[in-house]
Amino acid sequence: MINNKSKYTNLIKSEAKRLGFLSCGISKAGFLEAEAPRLENWLNKQMNGQMSYMENHFDKRLNPTLLVDDAKSVISLLLNYYPSEIQNTNSYKISKYAYGQDYHFVIKEKLTALLHFIQTEIGEVSGRAFVDSAPVLDKAWAAKSGLGWIGKNSNLLTKQVGSFYFIAELIIDLDLEYDNPTTDHCGSCTACIDACPTDAIVAPYIVDGSKCISYFTIELKENIPTEMKGKFNDWAFGCDVCQDVCPWNKFSKPHNEPLFNPNPEVLSFTKKDWEEITEEIFKKTFKDSAVKRTKIGGLKRNINFLKD
């Protein structure tokens, strides 16, 4: 006879798949002991740059039971965003995750639907949905639940589909069956370390966030340091270099989420189009996109830095 834990686990994983998630793994909620010294060391070395929010909620980042009362399980989910088409080659580049609609809203809707399903099918279950704007170590939880391993570029990797996916969590007060971590398959490969244009991967598995092109083009609010001149390889919003060169991403398959399909302008814009972008065109093109985070001023700053 199937036990309830197994039954509920299978129900949840089946519904996650129906909602379009690539995969679903489950871990027992608790303190992430191995992550505590890593996070502390990373912050002490100021690898978060001006991302001061990374210093907030230190204890909550490591322990989901402080985020959700009586938390029992962390459900980790992956949502593919690998596009079927990429930008015009004569263009300033934006990270592939920003081609379509802002993932925060797309994922939150799916997580809300999954939680509603759990409450309808199983009963009184409390929980919270988390996308990457919340203090949850999403990659650590995804790795703990066997969805992949954390690679030398600090991204979650899988043998089946590489790393072009979003990670999200649902933390609930229900005991479930838990998955086991997988093994690291980076081996002796250093492709990501060798390819990083700004040497942000300072050691295997350690990324200095304050040296990353994504940090400079999205998080940094002041002028980009002049010593970075000529190193950005035309990246105007984010950077995919360490993922593009990863051998496991040869197995990436296009997503099937219509909301992640790009606005045609995103693919067709030339450098001239980007350089001449107006507030009106910016708002029209990126009104539902993660690119709006930089605002028109931030995007123009990035383009001027690349152009000069």
From Swiss-Prot:
Gene Ontology CC terms: cytoplasm
**Protein keywords:** 4Fe-4S, Cytoplasm, Iron, Iron-sulfur, Metal-binding, Oxidoreductase, Queuosine biosynthesis, Repeat, tRNA processing
Which molecular function GO terms apply here?
A: 4 iron, 4 sulfur cluster binding; epoxyqueuosine reductase activity; metal ion binding
The GO biological-process annotations, alphabetized, read as: queuosine biosynthetic process; tRNA modification
Taking the record's annotation, the residue ranges forming a coiled coil are none
Q: Where does [4Fe-4S] cluster 2 bind?
A: C196, C212, C239, C242
Classification via PROSITE patterns: 4FE4S_FER_1, 4FE4S_FER_2
Q: What is its EC number?
A: 1.17.99.6
**Cofactor(s) this protein requires:** cob(II)alamin; [4Fe-4S] cluster
Q: What functional role does this protein have?
A: Catalyzes the conversion of epoxyqueuosine (oQ) to queuosine (Q), which is a hypermodified base found in the wobble positions of tRNA(Asp), tRNA(Asn), tRNA(His) and tRNA(Tyr).
For this protein, the record's HAMAP family field holds:
QueG (MF_00916)
- What this protein is called in its record is Epoxyqueuosine reductase
Q: Which organism is it from?
A: Flavobacterium psychrophilum (strain ATCC 49511 / DSM 21280 / CIP 103535 / JIP02/86)
Q: Which gene encodes it?
A: queG
